[in-house]
From Swiss-Prot:
Keyword Isomerase in annotation: yes
Keywords: Isomerase, tRNA processing
Annotated protein name in UniProt: tRNA pseudouridine synthase A
Gene Ontology biological-process annotations: tRNA pseudouridine synthesis
Family, similarity comment: Belongs to the tRNA pseudouridine synthase TruA family.
Length: 289
């Protein structure tokens, strides 16, 4: 009996690992990662968790470190705590202390060896472009407005399909990266138009610093007939970073899903709200000449 009681006491004293599925509007944040100056998603979450649990120190670790202004509808993170609060109640408890720009949709108990970042098998990002000819105040926080021409999504998709596979993406890596190389595997790409919105999904085992925004900037140049598909391929295959100058703005980008060998949250939860607007195709921009 004493041994059982002792084992139970030890079990209760061990830290518990809690996984979170998080959404945030990145507009008002300096990115996910805690910074010396600026409001980060990580710092706000850590303050909220610390206020609810005595386990110290609290560090919230994310699957993807999104940049300043980038959103997330399917970010996954974890932290260790005392277990005082049941795992499935953490979402509601945190939402009561977080600003409206951050919402925790689910919380779950995971083994202490599970890691939000290192256990992930892929990340999926979506970039959304508003291609209507008139400004739209309510879409501007979530989309890049390209109104000059109607984007040629067929050419963009042709260029996009070519990046699938294991490649060196030096052309799409911003300065300041601490990675030893620019090698990664793009597993899936998908470009689709819904009315005046053009969405670009990219799924990879890992992403380089600034990769999606630089890539989208080049795809838009293809879609506006400023460069050819062949020129797009030449730039990235020859690692011509100096010729990849225009990066898409951060507000159109969202981390929409993180994959694991065993999915711990409902698989489609990240797709149920953002960004899937239903727009008409009235008054399209003129086609590029």
């Amino acid at each position: 009996m004493e041994t059982e009681a002792s084992n139970e006491s030890i079990e209760k004293s061990l830290p518990k690992r809690i996984a979170l599925l998080i959404q945030y509007n990145g507009s008002g944040f300096c990115g996910w990662q805690r910074q010396k100056e600026g409001n980060s998603v990580q710092s706000i979450l850590e303050e909220a968790v610390s206020s609810l649990d005595p386990f110290q120190p609290i560090k919230v670790v994310a699957a993807g470190r999104t940049d300043s202004g980038v959103h997330a509808s399917g970010q996954v993170a974890h932290f260790d705590c005392s277990g005082f609060i049941p795992a499935n109640r953490w979402a509601a408890a945190l939402n009561g202390r977080l600003p409206k720009a951050i919402r925790v949709r689910y919380s779950a108990l995971r083994p202490i060896t599970w890691h939000a970042c290192f256990s992930a098998t892929y990340r999926r990002y979506r970039y959304t472009i508003y291609n209507g000819c008139k400004p739209n105040l309510f879409l501007s926080p979530w989309c890049w407005h390209r109104y000059q021409f109607r984007l040629d999504e067929n050419l963009m998709n042709l260029a996009l399909q070519g990046i699938k596979g294991f490649h060196d993406f030096t052309a799409f890596q911003r300065a300041g990266s601490n990675r030893p190389n620019a090698l990664t595997t793009v597993e899936d790409v998908h470009l689709f138009r819904q009315g005046d919105l053009v969405s670009i999904d990219i799924q990879a085992t890992g992403f380089l610093y600034g990769m999606v925004r630089l890539l989208v900037g080049q795809l838009v140049a293809v879609g506006e007939h400023r460069i050819s598909v062949a020129e797009f391929e030449r730039r990235w295959k020859l690692k011509l970073r100096e010729e990849v100058r225009e990066a898409a703005p951060p507000n159109g980008l969202s981390l929409i899903r993180v994959g694991y060998e065993t999915m711990i949250f409902p698989e489609n939860i990240a797709f149920d709200s953002f960004p899937f607007f239903s727009l008409s195709t009235s008054d399209p921009p003129p086609s590029p000449q």
